[in-house]
Swiss-Prot record:
Pathway: Amino-acid biosynthesis; L-histidine biosynthesis; L-histidine from 5-phospho-alpha-D-ribose 1-diphosphate: step 1/9. This is ATP phosphoribosyltransferase regulatory subunit. It comes from Bacillus cereus (strain B4264). Pfam families: tRNA-synt_His. This function is generally fulfilled by the C-terminal part of HisG, which is missing in some bacteria such as this one.
Length: 420
């Protein structure tokens, strides 16, 4: 029964010191940026009923959920997604729209062993509810660009795609569910050879505009030239409108001065099936890992109540932390300036001194050792140059100068003066 007591479950890990501090800083800066832009916070439980995620099309694979039972035998899951619980909250209550909400929390997905993915990650995100025009998508992209700028993330890009265009192609070519799932992997992975073979095996007419658009789809990434290519092959009004929405987004964001942070990828298809229109993915060049994901999901909230249009995105906090660790100077833990050693009956004075020193910008630390020599040893080990001893009715200040020497004592001590 104790075989695994020293190990972590697959896909999880411990976070220590530097990473904990950075995770907290990233979450807080994201939160403040989103609050400044008018978003309001929502928090949902870490555990949800399985039924919350078990609606039509099953946007999240059942095998990826951590499932267990509550006291009444009902199936409970650790939330594998943040957007669906938010949709539950919005759909089951009456709201004045539009709504702009923000959140932060852990999500849990059981990825395959050795996949290199963590099963527990931290996400912070935003959602714009009740608006079906392109202003909502633009608001989300601008918000996340500004947030990443404040975090001083270097060399990032937000890719803009359009899942509606892909769905129009699939529908027009009558590609069924199983085939569609295979096709999706070819396009997302930009596997040109496999896609060409798929078209050949399906005996699709390569002269047909829609087939030509399908075959080109993985190659349609870059700037506005991509839009021009897609427009030439769009064979229905629905396709043209889907492409026009991406064009309008790109031009508006570029006009605002954020053009260097965005690009277009019409071959991008989100793995979550609830997206219905424009989608986003963000990357950092040096890492290659996804740091932002999201899009429009106009049909999701209707699973829980009133049908409301919505768009949102999530920032992968763990990946941001990884990027900051690689891009910035090595992190140094908060350096202790002074250790205060005290006799137990002088704790009140020691605590008061610590507070006074902190007000002066000094990081003062109360010693946990009862023996002064142990305090000296701790200070040397941690490169702390000053020890103050609170003893009887007076204070003694020691500094390290090849050995511990008395710097000031009694009434002459600067720290004694602060206490008076």
């Amino acid at each position: 029964m104790t075989k695994w007591k020293r190990a972590n479950p697959n896909g999880t890990r411990d976070y220590l010191f530097e990473e904990c501090t950075l995770i907290e800083e990233v979450e807080q800066k994201l939160r403040l940026t989103f609050l400044e832009r008018g978003y309001e916070e929502i928090r949902t439980p870490t555990i949800e009923f399985y039924d919350v995620f078990a609606f039509q099309n099953r946007p999240i694979d059942e095998e990826k959920m951590y499932k267990f039972f509550d006291e009444k035998g009902r199936i409970i899951v650790l939330r594998p997604d943040m957007t669906i619980p938010l949709a539950r909250v919005i759909g089951t209550q009456r709201w004045d729209t539009p709504l702009k909400v923000t959140y932060s929390g852990n999500v849990f997905r059981a990825n395959e062993s050795h996949s290199g993915k963590y099963n527990e990650i931290v996400q912070s995100g935003i959602e714009v509810i009740g608006i079906d025009n392109v202003r909502a998508e633009i608001e989300c992209v601008i918000s996340v660009i500004q947030a990443l700028q404040k975090l001083k993330v270097q060399s990032f890009t937000i890719e803009i795609g359009q899942v509606q265009l892909y769905k129009c192609i699939v529908k027009k070519l009558s590609i069924q569910d199983e085939e569609e799932r295979v096709l999706r992997t070819y396009i997302e992975s930009k596997n040109y050879a496999a896609l060409s073979n798929f078209i050949g095996e399906k005996k699709l007419d390569r002269c047909d505009e829609t087939v030509r658009l399908l075959e080109k789809l993985p190659r349609l990434f870059g700037n506005l030239e991509v839009i021009e290519e897609a427009e030439k092959l769009a064979s229905s009004n629905e396709m043209k409108m889907a492409i026009a929405r991406v064009k309008e987004m790109y031009e508006t964001i570029e006009m605002l001065g954020y053009g260097s942070y965005i690009s277009i990828d019409l071959g991008m298809i989100q793995h979550l099936d609830y997206y219905t229109g424009v989608i986003f993915k963000g990357y950092i060049y040096e890492i290659g890992e996804e740091i932002v994901s999201g899009g429009r999901y106009d049909e999701l909230i209707g699973n829980f109540g009133e049908m409301l249009p919505a768009v949102g995105l999530a920032v992968q906090v763990n990946q941001i932390v990884k990027a900051l660790q690689e891009q910035q100077e090595p992190y140094e833990r908060n350096q202790i300036d002074i250790v205060i050693h005290y006799e137990l009956n002088r704790l009140a004075e020691a605590e008061r001194l610590r507070n006074l020193l902190r007000k002066d910008g000094k990081n003062a630390w109360l010693s946990l050792f009862s023996n002064l020599s142990d305090t000296f040893q701790f200070a040397r080990k941690n490169k702390i140059g000053t020890v103050v001893e609170a003893k009887n009715e007076y204070l003694v200040e020691y500094v390290w100068n090849e050995k511990w020497v008395v710097q000031k004592e009694g009434e002459a001590s600067c720290v004694t003066f602060k206490l008076r």
